[in-house]
UniProtKB/Swiss-Prot annotation:
The precursor is cleaved by a furin endopeptidase. The gene is Mmp11. Residues 1-35 form the signal peptide. It is found in: Secreted, Extracellular space, Extracellular matrix. A motif (Cysteine switch) lies at residues 82-89. Gene3D superfamilies: Collagenase (Catalytic Domain), Hemopexin-like domain. Zn(2+) 1 binds at residues 168, 170, 183, 196. Ca(2+) binds at residues 175-176, 178, 180. This is Stromelysin-3. Its cofactor is Ca(2+); Zn(2+). Pfam families: Hemopexin, Peptidase_M10. Its EC number is 3.4.24.-. InterPro entries: Hemopexin-like_dom, Hemopexin-like_dom_sf, Hemopexin-like_repeat, Hemopexin_CS, M10A_MMP, MetalloPept_cat_dom_sf, Pept_M10_metallopeptidase, Pept_M10A. GO terms for molecular function: metalloendopeptidase activity; metallopeptidase activity; zinc ion binding.
Amino acid sequence: MARAACLLRAISRVLLLPLPLLLLLLLLLPSPLMARARPPESHRHHPVKKGPRLLHAALPNTLTSVPASHWVPSPAGSSRPLRCGVPDLPDVLNARNRQKRFVLSGGRWEKTDLTYRILRFPWQLVREQVRQTVAEALQVWSEVTPLTFTEVHEGRADIMIDFARYWHGDNLPFDGPGGILAHAFFPKTHREGDVHFDYDETWTIGDNQGTDLLQVAAHEFGHVLGLQHTTAAKALMSPFYTFRYPLSLSPDDRRGIQHLYGRPQMAPTSPAPTLSSQAGTDTNEIALLEPETPPDVCETSFDAVSTIRGELFFFKAGFVWRLRSGRLQPGYPALASRHWQGLPSPVDAAFEDAQGQIWFFQGAQYWVYDGEKPVLGPAPLSKLGLQGSPVHAALVWGPEKNKIYFFRGGDYWRFHPRTQRVDNPVPRRSTDWRGVPSEIDAAFQDAEGYAYFLRGHLYWKFDPVKVKVLEGFPRPVGPDFFDCAEPANTFR
């Protein structure tokens, strides 16, 4: 203090100012240090500049292990990882969690039948696309638990879904394109069930040209159901976004959600209903009995096979088997009507077109679904330029899904989705497909462009380059697709 007083007296003599006047001038002039620390007016009041700093401050010790592929340029020239906005727990990496990677939020729903409502939608996508994607994201969790989800369109739902910008009322502001993609609130918290997506992201479905809504939504719904972030490799509940297709739960995700809610409940079996001896005598209605027990997948042939949303669906006698990345999914086989209400049983053929619509054939009729929503049918095959007996198999071929072939007996037709007609009502002979049997039950194309033809318990793999069946085929379907025991005598 003595030194400061001496310094002020010295300055007063140099400037020829009385000491009281010098002190008054120092108080009135703005402090250079304070001026440097104060942000520009536009930044001080900008809602975006303040929010993300508060949010990222609550994300402890997570950015050091982020792969470079997760980082994107920000408007300021720095880099930000694409990630969920739910803060990570500090003890996610502690020793206690190394064996059990999944982390629970401490809450769970006390019921298994939940409702959801979408309040606002992103501008890039059609509303029905968003609804279908949200339903698929919830289905990822319902397939491995007893949970069910039903959409409602008014009032308060258990899960409230919204697309919002910047500050939106929950003290977790969004930051514009990139960075924070979405966040959600856990069960038994003050905003339980709320899920918010950043409206300013470039939302897409099923591709990496933007941010895949299906993957982000499925991740956020994991939070809504009670899961925290995990450090397990390739887990859906990792805090950082990486595009993966098709979407699937990791073993860690599955263990976590089943720890909270258990495994899916199997429908109780009951004796098959008996028909009265007078059934049909006083009515012209036909009673359709759904099968109660699926056929043995290792002993059966299949009615139809199709690649739908990047997954394989095998159809038989009203049931469907769903394979993702070569693995049968939990909860399957299941009744096909679980996905496609009103679908007849059995189906003769099925395929998914380039627009994502799914076509089913039975007898002289066909049906079209947009996802799981029926949009057409039953309609006559004659509308497509086909006459006579049913379609036995349908094959979508080519990377653009623009080559569709219908097979029947030893004949085939090429179908044009744009005109909704076959190119010629007169079929060509299936001998054009070298090595493929004349009579087939089903056909599909894999992700690498190979075509598969099924007949009975066997399948033939067709090379699109050499335009013929590969050496070593046919092979049995059961062992190659469902891990069945290899038959003792296999026809080669």
